[in-house]
């Protein structure tokens, strides 16, 4: 009499064979050397369902991306927690990677021109004149005086009547309330200090009245006024990395720092 095949026995044998093959494959992967030559310990039970990303020390110090690529952070169950698109040919260093991994929101990395785009959309409104007929001295005890009808310079003087007296008007910004935008006007005139480029002399620009509203594209006459103790700094709104500065035997200009002098003492009108 023919023996009826035991289907359950065949399934059992098949399962055993697959289990052996799976064990062999797992063993092969476990013993295979990583492409990045990095070993990882077992995932602790308390780390389940949490964000997983490579340690910064396990990544080359500076990675160069020559193509568009996304960085994705996933949980242990495969759920995408956040991702970020990296721009074409962007250089990504340790700090960038760490910031991306710790960022709680998805966002596109903005180009370096983003701050300038932000500034160009800002609007400034005059509040009031906050200083009248004040004198500006630099740390070399030089006083700002008129060089000619168009430019200013700094010199050591004995008679303060030679000094330029400034009125200072304060503005408020539509988007940034952390700074104090101001405009400098030569007292009893319609001449306003107007910035150009780095190492270029500031101009005395004539306007019929103090601008009530100034937009981001017309900010050459505005400076962010900062004080540190008795020192005063005027940072160009049009060029946020440049200060109004004095330079030995030269005109008042825009500069980043030494050898130009960027800090001033304001002598208030005592009248």
From Swiss-Prot:
Q: What does the UniProt PTM comment say about this protein?
A: Acetylated within its nuclear localization sequence, which impacts subcellular localization. Proteolytic processed by CAPN1 in a calcium-dependent manner. Cleavage from 31 kDa precursor to 18 kDa biologically active molecules.
Entry GO MF terms: copper ion binding; cytokine activity; interleukin-1 receptor binding
| BP GO annotations | cellular response to heat; cellular response to lipopolysaccharide; cytokine-mediated signaling pathway; fever generation; immune response; positive regulation of cell division; positive regulation of cytokine production; positive regulation of immature T cell proliferation in thymus
Q: What would be one Gene Ontology cellular-component term for the protein?
A: cytosol
One short Pfam family name for this protein? IL1
Family label:
Belongs to the IL-1 family.
What function does the entry list?
Cytokine constitutively present intracellularly in nearly all resting non-hematopoietic cells that plays an important role in inflammation and bridges the innate and adaptive immune systems. After binding to its receptor IL1R1 together with its accessory protein IL1RAP, forms the high affinity interleukin-1 receptor complex. Signaling involves the recruitment of adapter molecules such as MYD88, IRAK1 or IRAK4. In turn, mediates the activation of NF-kappa-B and the three MAPK pathways p38, p42/p44 and JNK pathways.
What is the recorded name of this protein?
Answer: Interleukin-1 alpha
Q: Which organism is it from?
A: Cercocebus atys (Sooty mangabey)
């Amino acid at each position: 009499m023919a023996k009826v095949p035991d289907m359950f026995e065949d399934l059992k044998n098949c399962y055993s064979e697959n289990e052996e093959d799976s064990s062999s494959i797992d063993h092969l992967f476990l013993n295979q050397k990583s492409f990045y030559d990095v070993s990882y310990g077992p995932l602790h039970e308390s780390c389940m369902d949490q964000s997983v990303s490579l340690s910064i020390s396990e990544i080359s110090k500076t990675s160069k991306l020559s193509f568009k690529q996304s960085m994705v952070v996933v949980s242990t169950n495969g759920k995408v927690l956040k991702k970020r698109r990296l721009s074409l040919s962007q250089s990504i260093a340790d700090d960038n990677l760490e910031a991306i991994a710790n960022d709680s929101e998805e966002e596109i990395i903005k180009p370096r021109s983003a701050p300038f785009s932000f500034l160009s959309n800002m609007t400034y409104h005059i509040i009031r004149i906050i200083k009248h007929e004040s004198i500006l001295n630099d740390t070399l005890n030089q006083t700002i005086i008129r060089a000619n009808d168009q430019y200013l310079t700094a010199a050591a003087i004995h008679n303060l009547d030679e000094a330029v007296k400034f009125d200072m008007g304060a503005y408020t910004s539509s988007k940034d309330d952390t700074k104090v935008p101001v405009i400098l006007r030569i007292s009893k005139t319609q001449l306003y200090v107007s910035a150009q480029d780095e190492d270029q002399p500031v101009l005395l620009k004539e306007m019929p009245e103090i601008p009530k509203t100034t937009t981001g594209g017309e900010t050459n006459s505005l400076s962010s006024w900062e004080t540190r103790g008795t020192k005063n700094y005027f940072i160009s709104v049009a060029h946020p990395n440049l200060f109004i500065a004095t330079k030995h035997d030269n005109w008042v200009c825009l500069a980043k720092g030494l050898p130009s002098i960027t800090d001033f003492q304001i002598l208030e009108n005592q009248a």
